[in-house]
């Protein structure tokens, strides 16, 4: 599986992306695990570690946008915020594309881990989460309605 969900520090859920999805089923499994968190009806936050993602296929960006659209229809958003750790321009472009089509349902903070030492040895330190959110190089994407109602 390309994404591993670590709930050890719930309500913070760390999702480590080990690669790009190998198949549609692999990607659907990722979406199913996300949906399961919603079905538990507890607030949570994501930390996505995308350091191992090298060449994300465009087709999954479209599917992710459709998934966000479906999440938006829910009465309550259990996802409170997401922090996305990146080290690749390709991943940044993919995220820009996804959120252009379908803005997030909760605040998103995108942090390039190449900026400084808030990540030690590829491990996010719990006391650095707020520092990442507040960091001047962190990009903030506001939850919103879609700019283009394409999907």
Regions of interest found by a model, annotated:
Residues 2-151:
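Amphipathic, Lys/Arg-enriched alpha-helical "gate/interface" segment within cytosolic domains
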């Amino acid at each position: 599986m390309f994404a591993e969900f670590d709930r050890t520090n719930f309500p913070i859920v760390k999702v480590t992306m080990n690669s790009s999805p190998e198949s549609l089923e692999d990607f659907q499994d990722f979406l199913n695990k996300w949906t399961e968190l919603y079905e538990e009806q507890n607030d949570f936050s994501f930390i996505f570690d995308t350091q191992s993602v090298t060449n994300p296929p465009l087709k999954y960006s479209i599917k992710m946008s459709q998934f966000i659209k479906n999440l938006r229809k829910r009465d309550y958003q259990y996802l409170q915020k997401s922090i996305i750790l990146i080290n690749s321009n390709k991943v940044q472009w993919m995220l820009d594309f996804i959120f252009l089509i379908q803005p997030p349902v909760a605040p998103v903070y995108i942090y390039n881990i190449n900026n400084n030492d808030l990540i030690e040895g590829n491990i996010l330190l719990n006391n650095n989460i707020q520092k990442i959110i507040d960091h001047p190089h962190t990009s903030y994407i506001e939850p919103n309605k879609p700019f283009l109602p394409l999907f």
